[in-house]
């Protein structure tokens, strides 16, 4: 994407999905915010959205011992701490448009069903729920050239399958506008004293089974990842 594209209209938004594999706590939020900062420094208008797996409507009523402290947004939303990371890195105020949960999504689909928004159709999880995810992402992206979508949880969990299906559909419809960044971990067991790429390979294989081929892999490790491991993962 060149700087000559800066004048494009909002319907030419680029979508960068950021997912995680192998284990939780790898820093998907920091990765997404860092990418956003780099793109913003190049002159693009950038925003973020966090997609949570849980059925709670926000983070305010979740035990902080279980989920961590909440981040209070300017509009009153009690959200995940990753929104605080977005706010600090991008130097913008975040709020409702930058945060969604599976509970919000299902509630909206059920309300639309009750209001006959689907004209009496039989409403199944697929395709109606992923379509609501896509609608929310596009709504959050309005007015921006690039949006980074952080998918909560770890690849392969049944709780977040809907989000990955939404990505697959968007990639199918807009292949030139959608990419996938997968954050993984390369362990280094003490008794072996070398990096192991197999967990990352299996995580990518999990994505492949859902019809997803990541465009970039961000590898976290306790030492420099050598070319041998990079080649294994790239293959």
Language model feature labels by segment:
Residues 1-235:
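Flexible phosphate-sensing "switch/lid" loops adjacent to ATP/NTP-binding sites
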């Amino acid at each position: 994407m060149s700087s000559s594209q800066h004048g494009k209209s909002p319907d030419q938004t680029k979508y960068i999905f950021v997912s995680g594999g192998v284990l939780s706590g790898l820093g998907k939020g920091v990765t997404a915010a860092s990418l956003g900062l780099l793109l913003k420094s190049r002159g693009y208008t950038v925003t973020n959205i966090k997609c949570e797996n849980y059925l709670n409507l926000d983070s305010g009523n979740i035990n902080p011992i279980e989920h961590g402290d909440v981040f209070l947004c300017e509009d009153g939303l009690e959200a995940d701490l990753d929104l605080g990371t977005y706010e600090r890195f991008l130097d913008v105020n975040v709020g409702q448009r930058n945060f969604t949960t599976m509970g919000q999504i299902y509630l909206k689909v059920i309300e639309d069903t009750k209001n006959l928004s689907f004209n009496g159709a039989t409403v199944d999880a697929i395709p109606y729920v992923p379509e609501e995810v896509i609608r929310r992402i596009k709504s959050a992206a309005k007015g921006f050239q690039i949006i980074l979508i952080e998918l909560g949880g770890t690849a392969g969990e049944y709780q977040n399958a809907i989000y990955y299906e939404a990505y697959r559909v968007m990639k199918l419809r807009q292949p030139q506008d959608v990419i996938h960044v997968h954050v993984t971990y390369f362990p280094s067991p003490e008794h072996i004293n070398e990096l192991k790429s197999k967990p990352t390979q299996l995580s990518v294989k999990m994505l492949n089974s859902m019809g997803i081929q990541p465009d970039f892999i961000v590898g976290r490790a306790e030492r420099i990842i050598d070319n041998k491991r990079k080649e294994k993962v790239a293959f």
